[in-house]
């Protein structure tokens, strides 16, 4: 039996690594993509994933990535993100452009190719596939010194909303996940005086899985996750 494929773009050592482990455990053939594919070697060995070098801001790279996928693409996670901080008067326009290319345009290219592939697939229990966008609270409200990140995440959220309304009736589940808080990562633990102040990547991954498993009679288009101590 051919395994379903779960693609994770913008893969690395944080949340995307937790997603890769989870989808592999769930029986998916995992495909990891990043600009620097070399950094994914150990994760690929651990999960049995295939690895592809891909610049998500390059349309040809993204097309080649999807063309190389073997098997039914049931999950695509658009995980690219770029953060540029600074006072609005001091920001370098080229740095801002590059950040928007990664977060907004990169999400568009990945979402577009995922939709193209899934629309051609036979549905399974009425569902052709699931496309998930990793968002942030910056896609809901802008913060000082963080305009480029907010611009990218607002654009990504708008993309996800448009795709949800267009593709849900065609059997493709699209959702945007607002990750409202910092994520525990190797080398980035929460302060001793602020226990439970960061999100556990394994717990976030379970939310992604729940979205994939949602019955189409009750699909979520947006969902927020945050630490229980977070003020919002």
Model-derived features: where do they sit?
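Conserved glycine-rich cofactor-binding loop
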Residues: 12-13
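A short, exposed helix-loop element centered on a Lys and neighboring polar residues
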Residues: 111-112, 161
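Rossmann-fold cofactor-recognition segment
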Residues: 46-60
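C-terminal helical subdomain
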Residues: 169-184, 190-232
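Conserved glycine-rich Rossmann-like NAD(P)H-binding loop of the short-chain dehydrogenase/reductase
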Residues: 26-41
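Substrate-binding pocket helix/loop in short-chain dehydrogenase/reductase
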Residues: 87-88, 95-100
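Catalytic loop of short-chain dehydrogenase/reductase
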Residues: 123-155, 160-161, 165-168, 183
């Amino acid at each position: 039996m051919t395994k379903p494929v779960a693609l994770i773009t913008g893969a690395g050592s944080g949340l995307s690594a937790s997603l890769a482990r989870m989808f592999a455990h769930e029986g998916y053939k995992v495909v990891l993509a990043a600009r620097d594919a070399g950094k994914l070697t150990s994760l690929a060995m651990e999960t049995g994933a295939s690895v592809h070098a891909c610049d998500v801001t390059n349309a040809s790279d993204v097309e080649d990535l999807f063309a190389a996928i073997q098997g039914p693409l049931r999950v695509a996670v658009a995980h690219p993100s770029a953060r540029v901080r600074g006072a609005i008067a001091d920001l370098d326009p080229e740095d801002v452009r590059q950040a928007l290319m990664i977060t907004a345009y990169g999400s568009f290219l990945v979402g577009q190719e995922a939709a193209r592939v899934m629309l051609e697939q036979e549905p399974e229990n009425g569902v052709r596939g699931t496309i998930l966008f990793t968002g942030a609270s910056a896609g809901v409200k802008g913060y000082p010194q963080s305009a480029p990140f907010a611009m990218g995440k607002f654009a990504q959220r708008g993309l996800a909303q448009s795709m949800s309304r267009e593709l849900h009736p065609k059997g493709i589940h699209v959702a945007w996940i607002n990750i409202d808080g910092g994520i525990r990562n190797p080398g980035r633990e929460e302060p001793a005086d602020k226990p439970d102040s960061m999100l556990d990547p394994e717990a976030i991954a379970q939310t992604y899985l729940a979205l994939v498993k949602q019955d189409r009679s009750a699909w979520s288009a947006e969902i927020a996750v945050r630490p229980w101590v977070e003020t919002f």
